[in-house]
Amino acid sequence: MTVCRFWQQGYCRNGNACKFEHPPKGGQNYNRFGALSGSGQGMGGRVSEPPHYPGLSEDAIQKDLTSELPTWILSCYGPGRDAPEQLFGGYPREQSFEEIRLHFYNGLMAGNPQGALNEIQAAYQAAQQQIQNTLQNIPAAVQFILDAANKHPNRIDICRESSKGSSTGGSVFGRNVNPFQQSSAAPLNPFGAPSTPSTSAFGQPSPLGQKSSAFGTPAFGQPSQPVSAFGKPSALGGGSAFGSPQTGSTFGQPSVLGAKPSAFGQPAFGQPAFGQPAFGQSAFGQPSALGPKPGAFGTSAGSAFGASTTTAPSPFGAAAQATQPANPFGQPSQQAANSFGKPAAPASAFGQPSTTTAQNPFGQPSTQSSAFGQQQPQQAGTFGSPSLFGQQQQQPSNVFGQPSTTSAFGSQAATSGFSQLGNATSTIGASPAGAQAPASKSPYHPGSTRQHPDLLSYATKNPAGGLDTFKGKPVVYETPKGAAKPVPHIRQFDGTLVRIWMPDGAPAYTADTEAEDPKVYEDEGVKRQWQSFLEKGRFEGGMPEVPPRREWCVWDF
């Protein structure tokens, strides 16, 4: 329990009702962390008892991760006040809503918002898996926290070390009291980072040399087999029972420390940030912790999203020549800059690396590649192909193969069954590598030149023949009330299920769904109504009386 600072100064108006600890006064050498000092005797000559941390119990963990689980689960969790370790946290598990939003906008600027959404979905699912693994092993979770008291450096050691380093300069966040250790002589930084002059807030070196989170390695609840959302692979059985260090970068891309730019250590478009020079400066005007690096666009150093490009005279005036397959955040054969430039041994968000790794009983990483390094199938725009009305917009080539006009919410044909009014070939990508696309029946008129995307271009199947993923999202089968068999669904970020209505792909062509007289589709009023719906999401002049042409529709929903 935290010692009351007013009690240390000789007064406390709350007395025995104070929620902070009042240690006995006198000549005793009182140490709240006496169990960590290594001595065999405590006060009064008694044998030291194992440390006790208020709030660390199986019931508390069960309650925290079930009935009191917060809505935003991409956060750290450490039960027990002043405990030497937390169950899980640190990057990439510990991210704010604003950081996730920034990640999406980076994907949107790159022309591939759906890829960013898929990666965010993978991160959310990995966090859920950590929580479930913890709930299934609560006794081991408690023991993991207790064992961390004998592993150094732990969170308590880092707090002590940061108090020594705070005398060299002002902290980035100010000189505040450390919640894990009280010292009347030197107020501590609550983030556990030593303050060094002229150091960026997002890349402070640590005197302890510890990697991972500010309080040790993000510890607990890692899935044993599922892939980590942000790329933390390791060899199964290669580490101890509590996991192994991270070898992958933020989004599944390995990186050498100092070889690639940080998302906070370079300007977004090669321009000065807040009046600072463009190269080698942080986006917040501070020098980059990794040294001078080129801008993310228009250079051969690698795109900010992992796809290597050739040098272009202007970041927006020339189409990038991709040397690797287009991928939402790229996994080229050569190492490239990942989305947020994290090195192979990622530093803490608050700069506390570690020489040892606090092991995790639920942190058996997977040998599979990161969800952020998986090549995503190319998705079409929300409504598919170019317009029938001759207003095809020529967009600049993009390394991700995505039109820049894609919806900001990455719907991409996920919410509408209509494509652009036209007969051009669909832009949805080909089947995954190694997948043999079977000959499928066309839903369009036999004389139409338009082709419907094959089912395997946006979905994968399991050995049993059922759907495994659909547009990059995992598929679950649920049996609705009154139904005879389960039907496939995809799970949204909020946990709701959305039914897949066309699990077998497009149906065969039938003229029954079109107007009897095909000449009605030549009417400008009909074209204008459907074009308005495709562009704005609503009909011009009310609901049309003419059904859409088959060539205007897709069945990938």
Swiss-Prot record:
Q: Write out the GO MF terms.
A: zinc ion binding
Ranges annotated as C3H1-type zinc finger: 1-25
Biological process terms from the Gene Ontology for this record are:
mRNA transport; protein transport
Positions the record marks as coiled coil are 114-141
Here the segments flagged for biased composition (Low complexity) are 367-385, 430-443
Compositionally biased intervals (Polar residues):
195-215, 243-253, 321-338, 351-366, 388-429
What is the organism field in this record? Answer: Chaetomium thermophilum (strain DSM 1495 / CBS 144.50 / IMI 039719) (Thermochaetoides thermophila)
**PANTHER family xrefs:** RAD201, SI:CH211-113E8.11
Its localization reads: Nucleus, Nuclear pore complex; Nucleus membrane
Q: Which InterPro entries match?
A: Znf-CCCH_4, Znf_CCCH, Znf_CCCH_sf
Q: What is this protein called?
A: Nucleoporin AMO1
Q: Which SMART domains match?
A: ZnF_C3H1 (SM00356)
